Amino acid sequence: MKIEVIKRDKNLLEFYLVGEDHTFANLLSETLHENKHVTFAAYTIEHPVLMARKPRFRISTDGKITPEKALEEAAQKIFDRAKDVLEVWEGVIKK
């Protein structure tokens, strides 16, 4: 995964998420929406073949946090949830 910044302003961040597709992009978008300071979070796949693994994101915030901070918090939340699932799974398979 690689992030290519397209545009960065005080309350706006646009970037490509290189190497990912709808699976992670949708999870990230939904997790960003859980943050009360995120006013807009969405992605698009600009071309279904040529850009299939390069979603373009746009994140806007209310100014209380930066879009970069919102992205960082969403990534951490996804990581924590995945860790919780792994711990539950490990508990199940050890029984």
UniProtKB/Swiss-Prot annotation:
Matching PANTHER family: DNA-DIRECTED RNA POLYMERASE I,II,III, DNA-DIRECTED RNA POLYMERASES I AND III SUBUNIT RPAC2
Cross-referenced Pfam families: RNA_pol_L_2 (PF13656)
Annotated GO CC locations: cytoplasm; DNA-directed RNA polymerase complex
Top-level taxon in the UniProt lineage: Archaea
Root EC class: transferase
Keyword hit for Iron: no
Protein name in the entry: DNA-directed RNA polymerase subunit Rpo11
EC number: 2.7.7.6
Alphabetically ordered keywords of this record: Cytoplasm, DNA-directed RNA polymerase, Nucleotidyltransferase, Transcription, Transferase
UniProt GO molecular function: DNA binding; DNA-directed RNA polymerase activity; protein dimerization activity
Oligomer status and interactors: Part of the RNA polymerase complex.
Cited function: DNA-dependent RNA polymerase (RNAP) catalyzes the transcription of DNA into RNA using the four ribonucleoside triphosphates as substrates.
NCBIfam families from the UniProt entry: PRK01146.1-3
Family, per entry: Belongs to the archaeal Rpo11/eukaryotic RPB11/RPC19 RNA polymerase subunit family.
HAMAP family registered for this protein in UniProt: RNApol_arch_Rpo11 (MF_00261)
Native organism: Thermococcus sibiricus (strain DSM 12597 / MM 739)
Gene Ontology BP terms: DNA-templated transcription
